Design a protein with these regions (language model features):
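Cytochrome P450
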Residues: 1-141
Length: 141
């Protein structure tokens, strides 16, 4: 998304929202499983105690009832921070603030040192069914 990168370079105050949109689009964790502790209903489906529920972050973070045009990468998306990539409530990832700080500093350094960086081929995702990890990403400076 060269247009979005240029917008970020020209408007560094968009960095926090850019980070949220990146995480929304490609959640670090692919899914999380929980076990019901009592009879409960979710989305009209009745479940008994001890049943397994799997939340797929990619589906939740691209829910069209929450995100307009959910497959579009938009660093000015007003509700980009409404993603569930770090969980919610008491299950929120304790590492969330550190992860956001690391991402912010990484992107600041990359963009300030290599403003012309761009992908020069297809990226490969490391085979893993729990977390997204980039195995290979060819770039040019």
């Amino acid at each position: 998304n060269p247009d979005q990168k240029q917008k970020l370079i020209e408007n560094p105050e968009l960095m926090p929202n850019f980070l949220q949109e990146c995480i929304r689009m490609v959640s670090p964790v692919i899914h999380m499983r929980r076990t019901t502790t009592c009879e409960t209903e979710l989305g009209g489906q009745l479940m008994g105690p001890g049943e397994k529920i799997v939340m797929w972050y990619g589906a939740a973070n691209r829910d069209p009832s929450v995100f307009t045009n959910p497959d579009k990468f938009d660093i000015e998306r007003e509700n980009a921070d409404k993603h569930l990539a770090f969980g919610i409530g008491r299950h929120t990832c304790v590492g969330k603030p550190v992860a956001l700080m690391q991402l912010e500093e990484s992107y600041k350094q990359i963009l300030s040192r290599f403003p012309n960086i761009h992908m020069s081929g297809n990226w490969k995702v490391a085979p893993n069914n729990f977390v997204h990890a980039i195995q290979e990403m060819p770039v040019k400076f």
